[in-house]
Amino acid sequence: MCIRDRFLQAVREVFETIQPVVEKHPEYEKAGVLERIVEPERVVKFRVAWTDDEGKVQVNRGYRVQFNSAIGPYKGGLRFHPTVNEGVIKFLGFEQILKNSLTTLPMGGGKGGSDFNPKGRSDAEVMRFCQAFMTELCRHIGQFTDVPAGDINVGGREIGYLFGQYKRIRDEYSGVLTGKGLEFGGSLARTEATGYGVCYYTQEALRVLKNDSFEGKTVVVSGSGNVAIYACLLYTSDAAD
């Protein structure tokens, strides 16, 4: 399925789900709420020029889709992967609106990244790319505007490089990026948090909806990234009983 089809499918599924609510509230249609939700408030595209270890200038594309800030600053990760393009980021940003709103925290939805492939690159090359990326991105983000995080290929190392460049340019030490190391403002157990959340959410759903628990059950986990790995660790521990 192409990324445009994925975006349209996600929009269609959301609209089908909320259709009964919309039918009871014609004022939503009059205000164009649905049309506004599916159109990003802002799409930022920029060139990222950086120098590799051979002294050659490389050029990548950078993106930040600031989808919706109705309930708070844009919030969503940065992804570095060769498959990244505007369509991918738009699809992920739309999903981020809904995920963030479900937390009940005042966070809007956004997503960003680049088609840069860190695989096979040295630490110095990754650092120079991150610095060049943030040099362009920094004018569009801020603790009250847009707070990026990590995603695929953007972990603690990359967040550190990005945050360092942000501080250098903006001359401020603020909560503009999540996923930082504990040494400079990061949160304890952030790496495990999403995977653990899957366990606790499923555990609570079983209890509330089925009056049941994990005891005696086989759990199937899809994937092998940070979310899946830490979900498996908690599922197989005594804490999941």
Briefly describe each language-model feature range:
Residues M1-D5, Y235-D241:
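Conserved small/polar residues in nucleotide/adenosyl-binding loops
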Residues R4-L188, E192, Y201:
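N-terminal ligand-binding/catalytic initiation module
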Residues N68, L102, N211, C232, ...:
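A generic "cationic amphipathic patch" detector
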Residues E192, Y196-S237:
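Glycine-rich phosphate/diphosphate-binding loop of Rossmann-like nucleotide-binding domains
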